[in-house]
Amino acid sequence: MLTIKDIHALEVMDSRGNPTIQASVILSDNTKASAIVSSGASTGKREALELRDNDKTRFLGKGVLRACENVNTVIKHNLIGLEAINQAFVDGRLKALDGTPNYANLGANASLGVSMALARASAKALNMPLYRYLGGANALTLPVPMLNIINGGSHANNSIDFQEYMIMPLGFESFKEALRASAEVYHTLKKLLDEKNQLTSVGDEGGFAPNFKNNVEPLEVISQAIEKAGYKLGEEIALALDVASSELVDEHFNYHLKGENKILNAQELVAYYKELVAKYPIVSIEDGLSEDDWEGWAFLSKELGRQIQLVGDDLFVTNASILQKGIKKNIANAILIKPNQIGTISETLETIRLAKHHAYQCVMSHRSGESEDSFIADFAVALNTGEIKTGSTARSERIAKYNRLLEIEHELKGGIYIGKELFKHG
């Protein structure tokens, strides 16, 4: 029986220069694998706890030595000797060791690092690719990338309220062709921004962070870039938004669009979205309303839920019980999947299975604070999520995921690129 022989954690750096955890697991056959945990900039209030040291003398309080110590002591001592390939049992032990609903004691960064490293080590020991180990024989589908090519909100220091303007290359036969087209649009966009004397500095996720007069201008210039690059707007490449509206809302559920000097209630904001969807080929809006504005979400879902994808990120925080509440209330029709919002691979799997059972789309996602770790690329293929958000075609921590997906596509001898089939349901 393959068992856990040793576990240890190290404080390393993420793509924003902040500390994070690298966890390593060694199995009884001496197979070793590691995983690096990502970290978010805009976070949902119901996310599992990311344990930080709060020692202002180190990394401005953002150190993770306490979380590393938890891995190197409590977690290590309680997991050594357990069967490695029983991921659900080990993850259950991690949850029980912590004893809180949100990993407030050990830290979700500690638990997830170990959970990821264990899955990777087990796959390696069995001489299987990670996507095959996690997904079995049905792991065949390459996801549609949602590439964040203009950054605003908390991901950039500019005047744009919406956090992400994305492109979705739906009209292609393969992942590699979809990615090539996206890269060409990205480079064409840079030239257009240069011509407009706009900044082409990039945000946390590799998208450009120019200053526009309002939140519509980015849609215009991206549309121009798609067509100038030689692609059909809406048919081959569609648009998507992540509004991250929990960052815009006040205690009265009014939404402050500072870039446009507007304050809108939920109904007015939904009307604004409807105008944008009517004018531009927007196929997905993420976090269109605040995580606490469930009444507003119900209205948004009623008004646009049959027309486009409505993704809950801060709304659901990859949590099966919160998703279940949304399902009962007919809120949203898709969920963003971020393993570090929930704490272990097994809990992430539970949420994905629940979503799929109720015909909610799943979008595998990175965080703004990333690393060279490409786990989510394998995870997206393993669970056939159909979509992946992992930044633009810039910054090596984003490219690592795309390169891994290209590698998987090659291993699968093409696999299945879901493309336009993504939204052909219901």
UniProtKB/Swiss-Prot annotation:
PROSITE patterns the record matches: ENOLASE
Location in the cell: Cytoplasm; Secreted; Cell surface
SMART domains recorded: Enolase_C (SM01192), Enolase_N (SM01193)
Co-factor remark: Binds a second Mg(2+) ion via substrate during catalysis.
Keyword hit for Chaperone: no
Cofactor: Mg(2+)
Binding site for Mg(2+): D242, E286, D313
Keywords: Cytoplasm, Glycolysis, Lyase, Magnesium, Metal-binding, Secreted
SUPFAM superfamilies tied to this protein: Enolase C-terminal domain-like, Enolase N-terminal domain-like
Residues at the active site: E205 (proton donor), K338 (proton acceptor)
Listed GO biological process terms: glycolytic process
Gene Ontology MF terms: magnesium ion binding; phosphopyruvate hydratase activity
Classification via Pfam families: Enolase_C, Enolase_N
Pathway participation: Carbohydrate degradation; glycolysis; pyruvate from D-glyceraldehyde 3-phosphate: step 4/5
Keyword Glycosyltransferase included in the entry's annotation: no
HAMAP family xrefs: Enolase (MF_00318)
Function: Catalyzes the reversible conversion of 2-phosphoglycerate (2-PG) into phosphoenolpyruvate (PEP). It is essential for the degradation of carbohydrates via glycolysis.
Family: Belongs to the enolase family.
Official protein name in the record: Enolase
Gene: eno
